[in-house]
Amino acid sequence: MSYQIAVLAGDGIGPEVMAEARKVLKAVEARFGLNIEYTEYDVGGIAIDNHGCPLPEATLKGCEAADAILFGSVGGPKWEKLPPNEQPERGALLPLRGHFELFCNLRPAKLHDGLEHMSPLRSDISARGFDVLCVRELTGGIYFGKPKGRQGEGESEEAFDTMRYSRREISRIARIAFEAARGRRKKVTSVDKANVLACSVLWRQVVEEVAVDFPDVELEHIYIDNATMQLLRRPDEFDVMLCSNLFGDILSDEIAMLTGSMGLLSSASMNSTGFGLFEPAGGSAPDIAGKGIANPIAQILSAALMLRHSLKQEEAASAIERAVTKALNSGYLTGELLSSDQRHKAKTTVQMGDFIADAVKAGV
């Protein structure tokens, strides 16, 4: 079977790490007999420079014709003074999410063996490790609710946002969380503020209704303020965390930083058909672009998420993840994962990609 992938490398380190993800995918194709065709499109700052807008029509049409989008990163100082809606991040990513109704965001975060020193957690806590999947509703809630705006003048001026969720929006994201938990440790922690917010009362009610269809999965509820604390005390006790848009925005970044490096974290944004946009959780890192030192693992793991969720190639996705684990366990690390006195051992972006691709070929 042939798959069509829209490749949007973007700005900063995007093209460098995307090249390594493509290298690893080539190894996957050879090992598993897959036929994946890639078409590159401009997005973000480079699209502004070449086409006058961050999301050209040709890019959007190319994404519409694809089975999935493999996204790099966008943005940088060069475009920061543009009007907000014309900047790379807001002018490209948000329209893509809206156009394809990418309502589900998956953010896995794992503390790998041997990298406990990277975590800001106390050593006795980090020694236990953790493996958490944050499932975030991405297109509803307070970020998109109407009315929204400002009114009045002087001391009477006020600003307002509306938090709004429908039963359908809650149910569909909850089902994804429970399905994900079935393939993991069979536990869902639903994050809300049901002691204060009407939206959260409905959220909790609908999640409990969905849970009836998943009797093999444990469900617990936790308030958002308590969740932020418990992630610092006992992250190893969480499996899948189900969150609304606002709460997921907060918690996914907290979970990410508990690993100690954004360079290891991937992200998937998907719609109800399984079509998705897969990207690193970090940014374009313009300060290190072109130096050959960027960590490509987040981009490579994004490719694994793409294989798993949009292309339904679980075996191939797992092969990439095992290869990444082998690299990390072998001490094959880029500079940001090493202490200052060990940075002379740092591997380059290309060396990391080579090692992981070779590990995939070897069938680790």
Curated annotation (Swiss-Prot):
Q: Name one GO biological process term.
A: L-leucine biosynthetic process
A GO-annotated cellular component = cytosol
Names of the cofactor(s): Mg(2+); Mn(2+)
Q: In which pathway does it act?
A: Amino-acid biosynthesis; L-leucine biosynthesis; L-leucine from 3-methyl-2-oxobutanoate: step 3/4
Q: Record-annotated residues binding Mg(2+)? A: 225, 249, 253
Q: Say yes or no: keyword Disulfide bond present.
A: no
Instruction: Identify the main location.
Output: cytoplasm
The free-text note explaining how the cofactor binds reads: Binds 1 Mg(2+) or Mn(2+) ion per subunit.
Group of enzyme by EC: oxidoreductase
Q: Which GO terms describe its molecular function?
A: 3-isopropylmalate dehydrogenase activity; magnesium ion binding; NAD binding
Intracellular or extracellular location(s): Cytoplasm
Name the catalysed reactions: (2R,3S)-3-isopropylmalate + NAD(+) = 4-methyl-2-oxopentanoate + CO2 + NADH
- Chain residues that bind NAD(+): 76-89, 283-295
Q: Where does substrate bind?
A: 97, 107, 136, 225
Site description Important for catalysis, residues in chain: 143, 193
Q: What is its EC number?
A: 1.1.1.85
- Keyword list, A-Z: Amino-acid biosynthesis, Branched-chain amino acid biosynthesis, Cytoplasm, Leucine biosynthesis, Magnesium, Manganese, Metal-binding, NAD, Oxidoreductase
InterPro entries hit by this protein: IsoCit/isopropylmalate_DH_CS, IsoPropMal-DH-like_dom, Isopropylmalate_DH
The family classification in the record reads: Belongs to the isocitrate and isopropylmalate dehydrogenases family. LeuB type 1 subfamily.
Question: Function, please?
Answer: Catalyzes the oxidation of 3-carboxy-2-hydroxy-4-methylpentanoate (3-isopropylmalate) to 3-carboxy-4-methyl-2-oxopentanoate. The product decarboxylates to 4-methyl-2 oxopentanoate.
Q: How does the record describe its quaternary structure?
A: Homodimer.
Task: Report the protein name in the record.
Answer: 3-isopropylmalate dehydrogenase
State the encoding gene.
leuB
